[in-house]
Amino acid sequence: KMSNQEHIIDEGYIKYNINWINEPLKVSAPKQLMEWRDKMHELKQIGHYAEINIGYGNISVKTDGGFLISGTQTGDIYPIKSEDFTLVTDYNIQVNSVTCKGEIKASSESMTHAAVYEADKSINAIIHIHNPKLWSLLMDKVPTTKKEVPYGTPEMANEIFRLFKETKVKEEKIIVMAGHDEGIISFGKDLNEAGKILLNFLAKLN
């Protein structure tokens, strides 16, 4: 298991550059986005590690002007509110920088979401969960990033691009991040597609 220190670095306090435009969002988070986020929270796939005070997991959808993503350290909030999301309006993978607008910052994990959206323009929704059992089970059985590559880094974004070139990730719509303890992302043309992929795998665990 990771030490606390590694976990803190991993969750990105904040090893990336953020240009945060702190103002209320003009757009409100779609109902479906809030519903799927709360469903994942109820299933403990998105949440908060109380002992080290760090949130895990997040969810995003493409929208006009960028993508809406649950903000940093919102894992313990339930039910989620529209203002717990932030709009990523710009990013630069190579220098690990993000511009976001809203009342909350985007975490470094936004970079991985940006890479998935960039890799396949038909993708409109992404869910990132933590599940130790499923993570171990699916490792190398579904498209899997290299173990030495940490989450929320330019290297991870490049790993995502590699998987889209070299694997059937477009069909499978799920990625295990070997270098991000317990981390799994699913995606699809909408949240229902991304969510059902995860629910199907979770059902097999029981």
PLM features per residue range, with description:
Residues 2-206:
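Glycine-rich flexible loops
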